[in-house]
């Protein structure tokens, strides 16, 4: 009996408010659009900051080797063997 009353009340209900007011849908669409743009900008900013931090840390690591020079001589030198005169 209660389910029949609920069904009857649902049939009498007029259109849903969201379907009757398209302006509300447009406003919600604009809010979601702006939300997407803001999130995209924040994501790009974060990626750029991470990339800059990685470059800075790489340069900092390279600074350790700044004072070092490569050897001018080879570790192993070739011996010059002269043939004795005959």
Swiss-Prot record:
Q: Which InterPro entries match?
A: CD3_zeta/IgE_Fc_rcpt_gamma, FCER1G, Phos_immunorcpt_sig_ITAM
Q: Which GO terms describe its cellular component?
A: cell surface; external side of plasma membrane; Fc-epsilon receptor I complex; Fc-gamma receptor III complex; membrane raft; plasma membrane
GO terms (molecular function) for this protein are: identical protein binding; IgE binding; IgE receptor activity; IgG binding; metal ion binding; protein homodimerization activity
Question: Where, per the database record, does this protein carry Phosphotyrosine?
Answer: 65, 76
Which residue ranges does the record assign to the ITAM domain? 54-82
Q: List the stretches on the Extracellular face of the membrane.
A: 19-23
What ranges does the Cytoplasmic topological domain annotation cover?
A: 45-86
Q: Which residues carry this modification: Phosphothreonine?
A: 78
Question: Where, by residue number, does the polypeptide cross the bilayer?
Answer: 24-44
Record-linked SMART domains = ITAM
Q: Key word Transmembrane helix present in the record?
A: yes
Effect of a null allele: Knockout mice are resistant to IgE-mediated systemic anaphylaxis.
This protein's membrane topology, according to the annotation, is: Single-pass type I membrane protein
The record, for PROSITE patterns, names: ITAM_1 (PS51055)
Q: Where in the cell is it found?
A: Cell membrane
GO annotation, biological process:
antigen processing and presentation of exogenous peptide antigen via MHC class I; antigen processing and presentation of exogenous peptide antigen via MHC class II; cell surface receptor signaling pathway; cellular response to low-density lipoprotein particle stimulus; defense response to bacterium; Fc receptor mediated stimulatory signaling pathway; Fc-gamma receptor signaling pathway; immunoglobulin mediated immune response
Effect the entry attributes to changing residue 39 to A: Impairs interaction with CSF2RB. Impairs IL3-induced production of IL4 by basophils
- What domain of life is recorded for the organism? Eukaryota
The outcome of changing residue 76 to P is: Impairs IgE-induced mast cell activation in the presence of antigen; Impairs IgE-induced mast cell survival in the absence of antigen. Impairs IL3-induced production of IL4 by basophils
Q: Which UniProt keywords apply?
A: Cell membrane, Disulfide bond, IgE-binding protein, Immunity, Innate immunity, Membrane, Metal-binding, Phosphoprotein, Receptor, Signal, Transmembrane, Transmembrane helix
**What does the record give as the function of this protein?**
Adapter protein containing an immunoreceptor tyrosine-based activation motif (ITAM) that transduces activation signals from various immunoreceptors. As a component of the high-affinity immunoglobulin E (IgE) receptor, mediates allergic inflammatory signaling in mast cells. As a constitutive component of interleukin-3 receptor complex, selectively mediates interleukin 4/IL4 production by basophils, priming T-cells toward effector T-helper 2 subset. Associates with pattern recognition receptors CLEC4D and CLEC4E to form a functional signaling complex in myeloid cells.
Homology family:
Belongs to the CD3Z/FCER1G family.
Quaternary structure note: IgE Fc receptor is a tetramer of an alpha chain, a beta chain, and two disulfide linked gamma chains. Associates with FCGR1A; forms a functional signaling complex. The signaling subunit of immunoglobulin gamma (IgG) Fc receptor complex. As a homodimer or a heterodimer of CD247 and FCER1G, associates with the ligand binding subunit FCGR3A to form a functional receptor complex. Associates with CLEC6A. Interacts with CLEC4E. Interacts (via ITAM domain) with SYK (via SH2 domains); activates SYK, enabling integrin-mediated activation of neutrophils and macrophages.
Q: Report the protein name in the record.
A: High affinity immunoglobulin epsilon receptor subunit gamma
Organism of derivation: Mus musculus
The organism's lineage? Answer: Eukaryota, Metazoa, Chordata, Craniata, Vertebrata
- Per the record, the gene is Fcer1g
């Amino acid at each position: 009996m209660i389910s029949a009353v609920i069904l009857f009340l649902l049939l009498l209900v007029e259109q849903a408010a969201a379907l009757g007011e398209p302006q509300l849908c447009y406003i919600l669409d604009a809010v979601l659009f702006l939300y997407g743009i803001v999130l995209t900008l924040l994501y790009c900013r974060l990626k750029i900051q991470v990339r800059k931090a990685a470059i800075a840390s790489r340069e900092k690591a390279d600074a350790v080797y700044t004072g070092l020079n490569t050897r001018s001589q080879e570790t192993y030198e070739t011996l010059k063997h002269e043939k004795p005169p005959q």
